[in-house]
């Protein structure tokens, strides 16, 4: 006969695995996994599930342990960080985390921002990091096509926001990605 244990199966928290000190002057820090959006072209929610933000203290502990000069915060939807943790510091806003990381690291960079969630407060926090770098997932500028993609915003709104950022910080750098030939 086969003995089956009744002990609970341990869970593996892949977002909070300990990491060694960075051997590079930069380090990527994953602050959340998954996504709550249902863009028409994206499969991330189907295989990574809903957004799960890491606890701010575990992120700050990792940043300190890595001892990197530049910290690159990464998630599928950075601006939604914390919305799934409503009782924590700065609930529903990534701004307190950006400010806390910036107080520790010489430079802080954010990858993958949804342009419709780019608040004035977040723009100011990014400009204060030492790296005024805006990685905006624009995808397209046509409002009707963006609606078919199940995304919000439009080219005019995006350009106004970029112009506003340029007025605040003339040295700001931008990166984006665009989908051409969207079949939807």
Predicted regions and their residues:
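Conserved SAM/AdoMet-binding glycine-rich loop
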Residues: 68-183
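Proteins enriched for Cys/Gly/acidic motifs involved in redox and nucleic-acid/cofactor modification
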Residues: 1-82, 124, 130, 155-167
């Amino acid at each position: 006969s086969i003995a089956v244990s009744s002990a609970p199966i341990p869970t593996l928290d892949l977002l909070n695995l300990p990491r060694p000190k960075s051997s590079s002057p930069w380090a990527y820090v994953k602050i959340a996994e998954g996504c709550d959006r249902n863009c028409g072209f994206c499969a991330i929610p189907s295989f990574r599930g809903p957004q799960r933000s890491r606890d701010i203290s575990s992120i700050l502990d990792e940043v300190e342990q890595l001892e990197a000069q530049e910290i690159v915060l990464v998630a599928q939807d950075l601006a939604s960080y914390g919305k799934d943790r409503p009782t924590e510091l700065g609930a529903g806003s990534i701004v307190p985390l950006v400010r806390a990381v910036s107080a520790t690291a010489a430079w802080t960079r954010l990858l993958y921002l949804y342009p419709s969630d780019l608040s004035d407060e977040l723009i100011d926090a990014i400009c204060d990091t030492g790296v005024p770098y805006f990685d905006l997932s624009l995808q397209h500028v046509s409002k009707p096509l963006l609606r078919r993609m199940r995304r919000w915003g439009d080219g005019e709104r995006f350009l106004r926001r970029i112009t506003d950022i340029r007025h605040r910080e003339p040295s700001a750098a931008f990166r984006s990605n665009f989908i051409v030939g969207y079949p939807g």
